[in-house]
Amino acid sequence: MTNYHFTGIKGSGMSALAQILHDLNENVQGSDIEETIFTQKPLERKGITLLPFSRDNIKNGQHVIVSAAYGETHEEIKRARELGLKVDVYPEFLGSFIKQFTSIAVSGSHGKTSTTGLLAHVLGSVEPTSYLIGDGTGKGAANSTYFVFEACEYRRHFLNYSPDYCVMTNIDFDHPDYFKSVEDVVSAFQTMAKQVNKAIIACGDDEHLQTLQANVPIVYYGLGDHNDFQAKSIKNTPEGTAFDAWVRGDLFGSFVIPGFGDHNVKNALSVIALCHYEGIGYEDIVEHLKTFAGVKRRFSEKRSGKQILIDDYAHHPTEIAATIEATKKKYHDREVTAIFQPHTFTRTKTFLNEFAEALSQADHVYLCDIFGSAREEQGSLSIEQLQALVDGAKLLTEAEIETLKGHGESVLLFMGAGDIQKYQKAYEALIESSS
């Protein structure tokens, strides 16, 4: 049994990995900032000790795993070096850890978390499966056949992995604080493709993924006729979305998923393709696709009086457009009111016009102040510059949250990767106190 200490345990990947090792009967503790973050709840439920950052947390006999957000200057890492302890950065540790399983990385600019969750759900219903999801959820199953994990392209972290399979959902220009252009992103995915050992499952509707070269088979999925796995006859139903899956021109079968929007159909199709490649039966895939309950902060819904409140992690124009589209398909008889908090000044500046175009698909738009990341506390851009590009957009603060009550039976769509949840919580508290 190993004694693990996680420096930065509340990060989504770190939290999930800590849960996995705990499930596998290792001793796990961790430290982080004292602010409450949604990823810590599952840690607390499992009885994993959470500490504030301190060099005193580091003891002899520990194996220290450090978040990629922290470097050698962190007080805990300095102490670990003084004691001569084994220290691994999260992506490096994960890259080594996955070698004991049939490993399946899920990568892509958008849709990673939802696809990882869906694939883990389907595989885990058929075979022992461990998984690490980007919403902070992790599970370690004894004697696992599969390990499904989210592999992020940021700073090329996913190049620490050489998985058996890699699902690639799409390539888009994001993380402009690191990537220079979409070509730079493509280059990272091309390098990743060369590291895959068995097969790549890639969205063939994405022009960038069509250019991939690899030493293993590439199985393409999507809505276009050129794909190996194609979705046809897509229809909205009371249960979600129904579609037929065709494999190289032959009907494989009909499926229903709880989600809405073409992006969710494609995510499901990638899971179907992977399962088909692994020899998992049609009936198992059908049964477990339709029972997927979703992942945290991805189209998470609740009712509040006559309104529908949705919390979503969307923080890139492509994701915002897809989330608004899915909302309109599911709630076609309601107005959609978007409440958006931009995440990082760099991303907001880079995609200012694209954000405006995506948000304009909503019936009403409210904008919250830009959330700066730990890497950039402030920037020269103001939220008013985005407001000027979106007709009728209004600014929103927590103190003015009561304004949302004026939207009757609207769907209130809270979107962002920062702390947009505090606005929704403030609104829910207001509704509860006035009921």
From Swiss-Prot:
It is found in: Cytoplasm. It catalyses: UDP-N-acetyl-alpha-D-muramate + L-alanine + ATP = UDP-N-acetyl-alpha-D-muramoyl-L-alanine + ADP + phosphate + H(+). Its main location: cytoplasm. Pathway: Cell wall biogenesis; peptidoglycan biosynthesis. GO terms for cellular component: cytoplasm. Belongs to the MurCDEF family. This is UDP-N-acetylmuramate--L-alanine ligase. It comes from Shouchella clausii (strain KSM-K16). The gene is murC.
